[in-house]
């Protein structure tokens, strides 16, 4: 029983200490970063003041407004 409690405690501490990776954005297609890679573009900004880096194929197409 003590071993089980110790194992659960260690797993809980490890899950709090190591983040799961970068925050996701734009319907889980983008990642919040300080800088985007060459193959990505900024479309929106994340809540943590980082850029939401999204590959161009996942960004919406620009539509021209008819006048």
From Swiss-Prot:
Where is it found, in Gene Ontology cellular component terms? Answer: extracellular region
Show which residues constitute the signal peptide: 1-20
Which BP terms in the Gene Ontology apply to this protein?
Answer: defense response to bacterium; innate immune response
Q: Which UniProt keywords apply?
A: Antibiotic, Antimicrobial, Defensin, Disulfide bond, Secreted, Signal
Write the protein's name: Beta-defensin 123
InterPro entries, per this entry? Beta-defensin (IPR050544), Beta_defensin_dom (IPR025933)
The primary site where this protein sits is secreted
Query: What protein family does this chain belong to?
Result: Belongs to the beta-defensin family.
Q: Where in the cell is it found?
A: Secreted
Q: Which organism is it from?
A: Macaca mulatta
């Amino acid at each position: 029983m003590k071993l089980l409690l110790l194992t659960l405690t260690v797993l809980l501490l490890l899950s709090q200490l190591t983040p799961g990776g970068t925050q996701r954005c734009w319907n889980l297609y983008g990642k919040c970063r300080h800088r985007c890679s060459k193959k990505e573009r900024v479309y929106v900004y994340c809540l943590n003041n980082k850029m939401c880096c999204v590959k161009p194929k996942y960004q919406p197409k620009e539509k021209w407004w008819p006048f």
